[in-house]
Structure formats: C-alpha cells, structure tokens
Amino acid sequence: MGKRRCVPPLEPKLAAGCCGVKKPKLSGSGTHSHGNQSTTVPGSSSGPLQNHQHVDNSSGRENVSDLTLGPGNSPITRMNTASGALSPLPRPNGTANSTKNLVVTAEMCCYCFDVLYCHLYGFPQPRLPRFTNDPYPLFVTWKTGRDKRLRGCIGTFSAMNLHSGLREYTLTSALKDSRFPPLTREELPKLFCSVSLLTNFEDASDYLDWEVGVHGIRIEFINEKGIKRTATYLPEVAKEQDWDQIQTIDSLLRKGGFKAPITSEFRKSIKLTRYRSEKVTISYAEYIASRQHCFQNGTLHAPPLYNHYS
C-alpha cells in the first residue's frame, strides 16, 4: 500500500504539457512484448514546454511533458435547459472520486473561458470568481471540434491558489503549448475547456503499487547518463490507451527520455508517486448559455463587462 501525502512534496514549480498518443510499441523492454503497434513520443528537441525535464535556471521552474486526462475519471457536465445552469453528472462506478464533496466545478471552466476571451479580444481581465481559492495542483486542457482534438494542455504539480493558478494556466495552455500554434478568437466557438484538480498524492511501495484507470502516476528515475529524470501520466491515459501497468511504466520511461533497454531490475529502481483527480469539462456553447443565464439572474459571478453574446 502507498504512503498517503496530503499534498505533493515541496519542489520547484512543475509545469506539464499533455499530448495525444498512438497505441504503443515499447521497444527494448526486455521481458514484456507488446505486438506490432507504434507510439509517438515527444522528442527532447520539441521546446521547453514539451521537454521531459527542463529546468529554467533563472526561475527554478521544471517542465515535464504529459498526456491529457480522459473522460473516464471526470464528472460529466450537462446543461439544464430550463435554467441554463451547468451541473455535474455522477461519476461512473469505479472511478477515482465520488461526486460527494467535489471541489472542481463547471464555474472554473467558465472562468477559464472568461480569461481566454478577454485576452484574445484585448479586454481587461475578468473580476475574481466566487469559487474557492484554495491551493491545488491543476491542469487546464483545451480541445476543439466534434472529435475533441487536443488543442493545448498545461498544468502544474505544485499547489497553486485556484484563482491565480487557473488564470495563469488558461493562457499558458492556450497560447504556449509548443506543440500547437496559439489559440485564436476564431476558434472559440469550437472549444471545450477542462479543469482538472489533482488530489490524494501517495508514495507507492513499488512501481506496480497503483491501479489503471484510478491513479495518475509520476515517476523519478536515473537515466543511462546518470541524470535524474521525471515523467507523468494523468489518471485516464493508461485506460484510454488500453495499457497494463508494465506497458504504462515502459511508455512513461521512454517519454521521460530513457533510451536503454528496460529490464525488470530497472523498473524496480523507479520511485513512483500516485495521485487521483477531479475533472470537469464544458463547451463554449455551454459557457455562453451559463454566462447569459447568470448575468440575467444575478447568480454566480457576472460575465466580463462587455457584450460578447451577439
């Protein structure tokens, strides 16, 4: 069993991007065969937001590449057609958290849309929201179109106050994910925004002390050059890719830049931290409907002081 931690360990601020993958062929794993499948793993030349471990000596910030969270561990949102309000549906059985005492809310996604809209149209930033300002590790993810293609995903494993953290990572994920061009105002109507709060950090007893579909994992290891590296997958990645634990670990090692053959003994040397997440997603259409309703009825926090509903 893992050793429970209430918050992530004290460390430099971590920024993580997320990326889509194809089903993997994990070469060099030694004792584990995965068939004739292929994977796309970011290279070390992709730029600082995609590097598996990049330290900016001037700021102490460490950037760790990551994958996006998937829907399986997330409360699903729906629009109440009578009131225009957003409400989370219950989580499916077996997911990481129940709907009881959830911190994440659809209003957090609305605030992210506020921030992005104001930036893209040159308006002053929106007033502070009314949801909790407690500190959490967090991710902001943007997807686009009917097939919800990834358009940007950046987050931090350091606990940040939600008001400033969501504001910062809204713009970072939308404009500075080096895998994509910056989002534009023309793309707004097709966007989906997800906010993920990371919780329940635990030191695992070994590299298999976690559950696929329940836990996200962050590993630390020493590469073939004697350099400590880190890499992480958010809670839904392994389940969405149909990986078992060893496939996930091996993929994560490759993602972290480990190029040598992966052996059972090397896997045992990994330090693994597991965690869970709360996630909510809304579309731009839901955001607009919710903002109109809230403005008309004086509930939640008012939309930015401009008319963007025409």
Swiss-Prot record:
Residues 26-92 are annotated as: Disordered. The keyword Transmembrane does not apply. Residues 97-291 form the AMMECR1 domain. Keywords: Phosphoprotein. The modification Phosphoserine is found at residue 74. Residues 28-66, 74-84 have a biased composition (Polar residues). PANTHER family: AMMECR1 HOMOLOG, AMMECR1-LIKE PROTEIN. This is AMMECR1-like protein. It comes from Mus musculus.
